[in-house]
Amino acid sequence: AFRGNQFAKGAAIGILLLTVFAGFRIYHLLPASLAFAFMIALVIGICLLAVLQDALALAVLGILAGFAAPILISTGSGNHVALFSYYALLNIAIFAISWWRSWRVLNLLGFLFTFAIGTTWGVLSYKPQLFDSTEPFLILYFGIYLLIPILYAIRRGSDRPGAIDGTLVFANPLIAFSLQAWLLARAAFVASQPE
């Protein structure tokens, strides 16, 4: 009955998320800012519910909805600072959830979505003039995903001594430093061009 209860809650929140999306995108009843605020409120609610009820499935639904929200509610403005600020808050929320629950899958989902969306934005929209507003987010994301495996090891240490999240321990520096090199190479190329 407990798992069925979680399924019902997850389905209800999923329906609410789809309702907000339809109200914005299909029926044009909600402005983007209000639809986004509703989605954020739903994501916060589902993540709190997941932690309080120790429900990993609800947490996964919340994080997936959280990463999808700016894509679903996008107006095409291209404001990368707002997008990366929102993802920074979402990643800090994942870190906070990691403080109470050692849910590895949540850490991996956050890492994958953050760097996949960031890399996609970089390939499609990055210009060297945006370096100063992009670099701090890369450093912040690297720092968050540097701390999460440490916290995971501490939390899991009593259950499984020596447990580490090797995926994040090795993938985080590999991807972050690759992106850093790419950002600097693009900036150096522009700086070397005659004016």
Predicted regions mapped to residue ranges:
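Alpha-helical multi-pass membrane segments and their bilayer interfacial helix-loop junctions
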Residues: 1-195
